[in-house]
Amino acid sequence: TYEMNAKRQHEVPVIGEKEKFFGRDDYSEEEAAQLLHLGKLASQTKNCMNCHTLLGNGAYYAPDLTKAWLDPAWQAEGSMQALTGKSTKEEAMAEFLQHPSQYPTHSRMMPNLGITAEEAKGLVAFLKHMSSIDTNGFPRNFGKIQGAVNGK
């Protein structure tokens, strides 16, 4: 999560308790590093930045992925878990990445890039990791604009 830091005048990441990721909370450092490496490699081989932005780099055609893990749409009360029928944020994100054409969310549809289940798991881990970086308030007002789903 993020909370407002009055001194810095923007929201900063708050690292919470250990939580399960794809049903596990016992990843070794080596396993976690391999998963992150797979996700970064998948983001490069699938050319995610041809459409998306990450840390200010890339294109502006599709949503900014810098804090995708924290996007309210993926939270338990958000629309994407219900839309995908998955019970956790990471499962919903992985399902969407593997079958984007089944879940129309914006006026611009994400193409099916042939992302495998393992690549999707790595991509979700990579996006979760990226969301934990203190970006000094960038992107501004992230997650506060309501009604961005379904092209509204």
Regions found by a protein language model. Give the residues of each.
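Post-cleavage N-terminal segment of exported redox proteins
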Residues: T1-A33, F126-K152
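Extracytoplasmic electron-transfer domains, predominantly the class I c-type cytochrome c fold
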Residues: E30-H37, A42-T45, L55-N136, G151
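Short cysteine clusters
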Residues: C48-C51
